[in-house]
Amino acid sequence: VSDKNKNGLDAGTIAGIDSIGVEASTDIEKALSTEADCVNYTPLASLRLGEDPDLDKKNIIMLLRKGFNVVTTVGFLYPKAFGEDFANEIEDACIEGGVSLHGTGIAPGWLSDLMPLTMSGMSEEINEVVVTESSEFSYYPSEEIVFDTMLMGKSLDQYNQEAGRYENWLGGLFKEAIYLIADGIGSKIINVDESIDLITAEQDYKIAAGVVEKGKISGQRRKWTGNCE
């Protein structure tokens, strides 16, 4: 765990269930001293939050080299999207440890990539693949996700000042899905275009995570387009 307040607690207690006899630790070396075949690596993404944007990559490569299979939701769905050097570094770590890496999620990870590839198997010719996702966060109770990570409730000026890492991280996730689909249907990506529309609140809104004040960001509409040869 990354939260020092959870250090030493039973993992079941943290999850809100009965104790399961597994101690949570902020010491990664201590955690890895146990015998395990696979590590479920699911922190808040370091590309978005924290002092070191590369921390997740460093940790995952370390785990792979030590011989742990890794399942993660921080990205790494299709490392090839970030270039051959990036993909080769991941592959070399897997080979060294004799293990595998599985990046997954709902979207990306299933709905925005695996489903289109599965459904496209029934098509003789594909001219365009369109995937639309709509997410409702007014019922999501996490301030850290809604306000800190997604920058909801910020002014437009605040967003423009703080959004660099957020947009790089989020764009990277969906670019992985785009490259995965393109390779899956036998196309080659020339470039990926990105656009964003920010919607501001017409009045104060009370949501599960707090309050979005009038004039602050209450919605985001994003679009990524992979242009193929």
Where are these predicted regions, by residue range?
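N-terminal glycine-/serine-/threonine-rich beta1-alpha1-beta2 phosphate-ribose binding loop
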Residues: 1-65
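Short, ordered loop/turn segments at secondary-structure junctions
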Residues: 3-4, 44-45, 68, 74-78, ...
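Short acidic/polar active-site loop segments enriched in Thr and Asp
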Residues: 37, 69, 127
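Active-site-lining helix/loop region of Rossmann-like oxidoreductase modules
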Residues: 120-229
